[in-house]
């Protein structure tokens, strides 16, 4: 049974810390986005190879998360969190001393493998620590904290790049990891109260995940979430080159343009939090997916040579990604309350799998213009709508 809250924290502090854990992914990606062209030159490689470092990170994230969920269901959240964060710290330091693109790719994979512990256990601890009726609200509040990462990281990354070089960005990530590890070690109590009651082997990993995916509502929710994050990461991987190389925005100003869409996420999350208190979550999702459809069509109609025409649908799509996420996660936690770690691991892993596919497609088809990025995001919007339609059942809207 969930406990009222983590006994060594007040609820606000716990939400802020868990939101920071969930933000490990965007923080680790967005911090070095302004440096991608610089890294390509420093390591004597192509833009396509450096873009691959984003896909490599997403791969490591997906793989790591699939392990952390079931392991935390069995052995507890705290010890697994500390192990994953330790891997993240060491790998971040390895990234800073990489002298070739191959070394950077390996270090980024390991950094992601360790960092994947944050999104999985951050949300699983919410299920452990708060009553069911508060989960959507708590996840929405966590989302606001999480969004500080993509809002601040490009600004900080651009400044660090300008004054210290791209290597220091990874050292800063390692330092953030150390601070979070120390907080978890000294202040975070164990929240999984029945962790010793579950048998665990490789077969149960796959049985748990297959059991989740066999349920149409769970499959549809995960597909929707994966596609939305795929579009998000196509935007993340594409905009450094679109903004800096195509529209000639200075690297130190990139964070401002990136931050506009983060403001969209914050606004959409606040509006979503207001709406779910008054309407059924399924109704709110239906309205949000209608806006996703409009944004998807706008990507096809946008003039690729107009920065404003590109940024307007991006603002809508990226903002909606932040609003939709807590609603879908809440639905999954309610459907799989006795395997919260596994459910969050699968959902979060598939999120970043969608990001891997979308950013990989962008890297493969990239033609040094915004058009490819717009088409990839539009395709992701269509897949997300299909996923949402799968979740619809008779009486689901009124439930």
Predicted features along the sequence, with ranges:
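Juxtamembrane intracellular "pre-TM" segments in multi-pass secondary transporters
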Residues: 2-7, 191-221
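Helix-breaking motifs and short loop linkers at transmembrane-helix boundaries and internal kinks
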Residues: 44, 76, 97-103, 114, ...
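Conserved MFS/SLC helix-loop-helix module at the cytosolic interface between two early adjacent transmembrane helices
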Residues: 63-102
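Structural signature of the two symmetry-related core transmembrane helices
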Residues: 79-93, 283-298
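Helix-loop-helix hairpin linking two adjacent transmembrane segments in secondary transporters
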Residues: 103, 132, 140-186
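Cytoplasmic helix-loop-helix junction between adjacent transmembrane helices
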Residues: 107-148
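A late C-terminal transmembrane helix in Major Facilitator Superfamily
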Residues: 333-371, 376-377
